[in-house]
Every structure is written in C-alpha cells, then in structure tokens.
C-alpha cells in the first residue's frame, strides 16, 4: 500500500489568512498542535504534517475503501529509524523528514520532502515489502491549460515509461473504482500507483513489490 500527497505552499488556501481559526484543533492531535506551537517554522510544519496525514489516508483507502478521513484522529509521530528512497525526485528537494502515521489502526511509514514552494509526502504500509519506489513532482505554470488530473497522469506516464523502458504511448492510466491503475500495452501492470495535485503542483508515486513480497 502506498499513497502520496502534495501541498502547494504558495497557494492562497495554504496561507494563514485563509485558514479557519479552529483549523488546527480540527486537523491535528494535541501532540501535533504542541509541535506546531513550538516549531521555529510552524507554517511549513503545518502542511508537512497535513501532507503526511493525507498520504497515509490514501494508502489506507487502498486496503479498505470504507476508511474515512478524520485528520485529528490520524496521528503523526516523528520517526528517526529507516528511510524511504525516492527514485526520480528533484535534486533541489531536501533530504526529507520521516514520520510514523496511524490511520484507523493501520500503520504507515511516511517521508515528506519540502522543495521550493511545495511539500510532497509518500506513505508506505509499515509492514510492506516494497521493491522500488518511483516518484515525481512538477510545477505547472498555468493550471487552466489542462485539468490537473490530465496533467498528473501525463507526469506519471513520462516517469514510468522511462523506468519500464516502454514508449509512453504503450502506457495508460485508468480508474478502477476510485483508484488509478497503470496498464502497459493494455494489460494491468503489477505496480501500485498514487496521484496527487494541489495548486500549481502535480505529483505521483509508484511502487513495485519486492520479490516474494507485496507492495
């Protein structure tokens, strides 16, 4: 199980002036609110934690579509063990902050990377055996030129065509229920795909299972 989420840190709805006075109480646990109050950069941390919650929720939904998003009940705790390796992430992104996240009893490892203007989170089930993780993020100068959904699918196909050594025309992304599915030459690929967009950013992540394991 994987999930990814991107937050445009410069989007108007990400600014403090646009935020409801009770947003933090509704979105974060008591421990997380303490982290925000004591952080040297609470604004950035707020959206790092939010992206961690969203990415883990998306991963949990893959396991059970009945899972609902109640952010204040999604606990995010700093994790100083292990690391999630991103393949294809921009070099200007920082090394990432790792968290452990619990959603409806399901546990996830999450890494959030912050670049110039965005926070990008990637969540994996804590007990998953994952082979390769690919991810990509792109800034779209004019999001009115095409739908964000079309843009993020284009990004994912460009990333995975290179990884799989297939021409982009051989790849397609379809929906099965609410989940994206990658097909290669018309056949479902044994990969788990997650798509995300917010503001001027689109992002994707894809996991291949480890040999003898599940992703």
What feature does the model see in each segment?
Residues 1-215:
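Core catalytic alpha/beta fold that binds nucleotide/phospho-ligands
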């Amino acid at each position: 199980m994987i999930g990814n989420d991107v937050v445009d840190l410069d989007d108007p709805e990400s600014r403090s002036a646009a935020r409801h006075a009770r947003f933090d109480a509704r979105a974060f646990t008591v421990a997380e609110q303490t982290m925000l109050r004591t952080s040297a950069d609470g604004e950035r941390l707020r959206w790092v934690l939010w992206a961690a919650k969203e990415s883990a929720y998306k991963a949990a939904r893959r396991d059970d579509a009945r899972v609902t998003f109640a952010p204040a009940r999604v606990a995010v705790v700093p994790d100083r063990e292990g690391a999630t390796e991103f393949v294809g992430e921009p070099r200007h992104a920082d090394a990432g902050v790792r968290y452990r996240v619990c959603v409806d009893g399901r546990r996830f490892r999450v890494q959030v990377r912050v670049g110039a203007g965005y926070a990008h989170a990637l969540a994996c089930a804590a007990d998953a055996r994952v082979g390769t993780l690919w991810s990509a993020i792109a800034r779209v100068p004019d999001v009115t030129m095409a739908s964000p959904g079309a843009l993020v699918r284009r990004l994912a196909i460009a990333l995975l065509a290179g990884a799989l050594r297939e021409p982009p025309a051989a790849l397609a992304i379809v929906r099965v229920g609410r989940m994206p599915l990658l097909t290669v030459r018309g056949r479902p690929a044994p990969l788990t795909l997650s798509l995300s967009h917010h503001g001027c950013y689109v992002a994707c992540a894809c996991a291949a299972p480890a040999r003898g394991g599940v992703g």
